[in-house]
Amino acid sequence: MPIETVILREATADDVPFLRAMIWEAILASPTLLNQRGVDAIQQHEEQYWSGWQQHPDPAFVALDTNGRLLGAITLQPNEPSASVQGWRIGMGVEAEVRGQGVGRHLVGRAIEFAKVAGAAYVNLFVDPANTHAIALYQHAGFVAVGTRDALIEMRFNL
């Protein structure tokens, strides 16, 4: 049953622990990625990314319920390091107990809206082929599979 009211807001520095936890949840749901790169290498990459986030934050949004409980998060990283970003790569995680209740749909919609306003040409993501629920969510939002990288499916939403 969908959560009736999902509140979305920009993430702040205070949200970094939650953002990290949600992205780590998404990584753990990706056995293909874990097997290919190894937990240690992924942890090292994540540590470097989040330590730099405080000084140069990428866009990120959190979803809350009406009581202020954090439900999920989505991050956007530029696909190319330039002033005119053509594509944003998203990473998303939703608390286990509220998956399938519309939180992810709201977060993905907000990321697409952000990218449109920013003038990007597309939004993309990488998803484990075994994560069929996530694939269905992204397809429902209008993403299409465009290839693979490191055995993960690349999905894209053209703006």
Language-model segments: which ranges?
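Conserved N-terminal entry element of GNAT/NAT acetyltransferase domains
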Residues: 1-17, 21, 159
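C-terminal "cap" of GNAT-fold acetyltransferases
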Residues: 3, 25, 121-135, 139-159
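Acetyl-CoA-dependent GNAT
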Residues: 10-13, 25-33, 37-97, 108-110, ...
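Short alpha-helical
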Residues: 14, 18, 70, 132-133
